[in-house]
Amino acid sequence: MGQKVHPNGIRLGIVKPWNSTWFANTKEFADNLDSDFKVRQFLTKELAKASVSRIVIERPAKSIRVTIHTARPGIVIGKKGEDVEKLRKVVADIAGVPAQINIAEVRKPELDAKLVADSITSQLERRVMFRRAMKRAVQNAMRLGAKGIKVEVSGRLGGAEIARTEWYREGRVPLHTLRADIDYNTSEAHTTYGVIGVKVWIFKGEILGGMAAVEQPEPAAQPKKQQRKGRK
């Protein structure tokens, strides 16, 4: 049988950034890795209803900086920033160093593989028909500008006795093209019949110029808006 390499792993350093960006010597590496895992585990559990896409961890000068990418920043921040302060204290205790938490808003959750997968799993847990949930996710992504999307669900679909896999695809999803910006993620729906696995691949277009183009995409767009205002 043909095997597939992880779409995110193969693109690291080419068009995908790492979720943990720090350097450590041999003695500290294991401790840093362990605290990274515990911080992510805590935040994922604590912010289960906040539509968290990814958690990026940096370690500048004996401190830890955590950036939470979420579609619902208001839920994470809380009233007058109280919730973020509580999270910061717990993260500092887990990591054992001063902590800073930044919030980054995900503008288009329909084009984020993790949020799409979580949306499908929540619908499956509410007993929505799996085909309807899949088609709705595909239509929303294509409507908002995705070049292609593939959604796969596997398990006891519809309560069937025998588990099976079904998938739905629209547009292009070129997994072998390394410069293709493909967002991939998974999620699990815990239903009365058992666990249903959900996988989502979203193709957003090709990135030319490698990591240099990925790390600074936004600043170039700002001067154009100012020029347009001047013309009016």
Swiss-Prot record:
Source superkingdom: Bacteria
Span of the signal peptide: none
InterPro entries: KH_dom (IPR004087), KH_dom-like_a/b (IPR015946), KH_dom_type_2 (IPR004044), KH_sf_prok-type (IPR009019), Ribosomal_S3_C_sf (IPR036419), Ribosomal_uS3_bac-typ (IPR005704), Ribosomal_uS3_C (IPR001351), Ribosomal_uS3_CS (IPR018280)
Gene3D superfamilies noted in UniProt: 3.30.300.20, Ribosomal protein S3, C-terminal domain (3.30.1140.32)
Family according to the record: Belongs to the universal ribosomal protein uS3 family.
Record note on quaternary structure: Part of the 30S ribosomal subunit. Forms a tight complex with proteins S10 and S14.
Protein name: Small ribosomal subunit protein uS3
